[in-house]
């Protein structure tokens, strides 16, 4: 996957290129990330990248010309098929379904705003989609962009050691993930569930699915409203609720 990022702080993206899963993906050639800094497209000796908004008010906006030129440079490098995304609290909220959709694109250009945002005409003429990581305001688009890159890259074939790791993540099937355990078998009087030690793969699968359904019901019940549960899932969830009521 090819990724271009428009940012005033390209150094921040070393967190993506140099560390963890995404760092290995870059090293192995599965993820290609390039940055364009609007400051490199300024024409004054101060490298000015902000400007006052029309109509007054507090704060500044990113200057149109350097930002637009940086986007054009990224588009030229990416090719016509690249999708341009502006990270904005006004955009569509990123969830696993959205991540799956974005992962189908081979080339993405992410525009990171700063100050009070960017000129609306840049959004109208240069941006294909706006995305948000939540209903809160950050100082810039860099952290949302890194969040998006990390989430999307996990779905690129070969990035994870086993594709099943991505398929079992929370939200991959609309449910929260089940509990996980490693050694020791007993920790401060808390034991690993016996079914996980049984070696019975079918029983383990059913237990994990039931725990996933139950955890979703308890922590994010609204997620279940959007799902058409199978007969198996409905039965497991009913058993979970019955067991929970008995221990209440």
UniProtKB/Swiss-Prot annotation:
Instruction: Fetch the InterPro entries from UniProt.
Output: Alpha/beta_knot_MTases, tRNA_m1G_MeTrfase_C_sf, tRNA_m1G_MeTrfase_TrmD, tRNA_m1G_MTases_N, tRNA_MeTrfase_TRMD/TRM10
Which EC main class describes this enzyme? transferase
Positions binding S-adenosyl-L-methionine in this chain are: 113, 133-138
Set out the biological process GO terms recorded for this chain's protein: tRNA N1-guanine methylation
One example of the protein's molecular function in GO is:
tRNA (guanine(37)-N1)-methyltransferase activity
Q: Where is this chain's protein located in or outside the cell?
A: Cytoplasm
Pfam families (UniProt xref): tRNA_m1G_MT (PF01746)
Q: Which family does it belong to?
A: Belongs to the RNA methyltransferase TrmD family.
As for what it does, the entry says: Specifically methylates guanosine-37 in various tRNAs.
Quaternary structure, from the entry: Homodimer.
Checking PANTHER family in the record gives: TRNA (GUANINE-N(1)-)-METHYLTRANSFERASE (PTHR46417:SF1)
Q: What HAMAP family does UniProt report for this protein, alphabetically?
A: TrmD
- What's the name of the protein? tRNA (guanine-N(1)-)-methyltransferase
Species of provenance:
Shewanella sp. (strain W3-18-1)
Which gene is annotated as encoding this protein in its UniProt record?
trmD
């Amino acid at each position: 996957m090819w990724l271009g990022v428009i940012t005033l702080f390209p150094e921040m993206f070393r967190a993506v290129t140099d560390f963890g899963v995404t760092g290995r993906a870059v090293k192995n050639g599965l993820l290609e990330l390039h940055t364009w800094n609007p400051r490199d497209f300024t024409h004054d000796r101060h490298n000015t990248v902000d400007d006052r908004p029309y109509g007054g008010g507090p704060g500044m906006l990113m200057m149109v010309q350097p930002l637009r030129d940086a986007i054009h440079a990224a588009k030229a490098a990416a090719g016509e098929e690249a999708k341009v995304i502006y990270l904005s609290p006004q955009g569509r909220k990123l969830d696993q379904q959205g991540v799956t959709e974005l992962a189908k694109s081979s080339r993405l250009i992410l525009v990171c705003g700063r100050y009070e945002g960017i000129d609306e005409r840049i959004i109208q003429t240069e941006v294909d989609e706006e995305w948000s990581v939540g209903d809160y305001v950050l100082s810039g688009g860099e952290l949302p962009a890194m969040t998006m890159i990390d989430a999307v890259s996990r779905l690129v074939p070969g990035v994870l050691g086993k594709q099943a790791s991505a398929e079992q993540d929370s939200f991959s099937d609309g449910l929260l993930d089940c509990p996980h355990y490693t050694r020791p078998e007993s920790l401060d009087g808390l034991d690993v569930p016996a079914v996980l030690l049984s070696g019975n793969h079918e029983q383990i699968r059913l237990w994990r699915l039931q725990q996933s359904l139950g955890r979703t019901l308890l922590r994010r019940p609204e997620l279940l409203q959007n799902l058409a549960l199978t007969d198996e899932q409905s039965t497991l969830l009913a058993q979970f609720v019955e067991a929970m009521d008995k221990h209440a």
